[in-house]
Amino acid sequence: MSPVGLDKLLQALPKKVDPNLLVGFETSDDAGVYRLTDEVALVVTADIITPPVDDPFVFGQIGAANSISDVYAMGGRPVTCLNLLGFPTKELGPEVLQGIVEGALTKITEAEAVLAGGHTTEDEEPKFGLAVTGVVHPEKFWHNKGARQGDVLILTKRIGSGVLFNANLKGLVPEAAMQACIDSLITLNKSAAEVLQQFDVSAVTDITGFGLAGHALEMAKGSDATLELDIDAIPVMAEAANMYDKGVTTGSNLNNRALITGHTRFDRELPGNSGEIFVDPQTSGGLLAALPESQAQEALGRMHDAGLDAARIIGHVLPSSAPDYLVFK
């Protein structure tokens, strides 16, 4: 569903006031947060994807990492997971289903969470994801809003997985580039979140289906600020930009471009289709975090020490120049 259509649908829903619901659907945040006590709040989220790869085990890993990421984006710790499966039992054998679940379990275990059950339904094609419950202190969770003027923006993973998966279906992506993409997607955002928790972050979101620009726009609007992004600093997966140059795209680019139209300014002309990478839909993408400039280099260094080699400082938070909430320079 398009982000614009989804927003209209959610805005039309009746809203129940509950003082313990600290984060609902009104702010397009990554997960809901519900206070249980003065010390504990639940982080609740669900996500489901179609297979970006043929290998069932890897599909399960990607689907699980993608779902668990929303808890990390809220500053939470994942605790329990439920499998959400759509499966064509007449077309695919039980070994495929088993591979998906086993792959997911490796990531659930790595996240130090537990698999508590799930639900499987008959479907025309495989679909997989998790409903995840996490915990966080009710006064210490992160929002996708609240970025402060003067803060620096760090992105923890490369972008470009959407176009690479489509191009791979056409046999256009070199094996090494495709494997690097998969390695990124099965990497949990656990280490990135653990590093960020050591610093004074003001806003965090994970980059998924709306692309870097779409999720950055949500952060900018929610923060009443403008995010200035350095085009040359944004980490891009090998061959992704090349695929756009060859005319490959995704089914989400058009809707993602519509989301940012009227709110984005490019301060330099981009050749060909190179601007498409910023609306490329991600699966299990990285975290985008705003934190003080005085802390950014140390945070980046700790991420690199933790093996997050793709992490980069990609921009700054500026006073709002609405309607230009995003400025690419």
Residue ranges and their predicted role:
Residues 1-329:
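Helix-biased detector of long, well-ordered alpha-helical tracts
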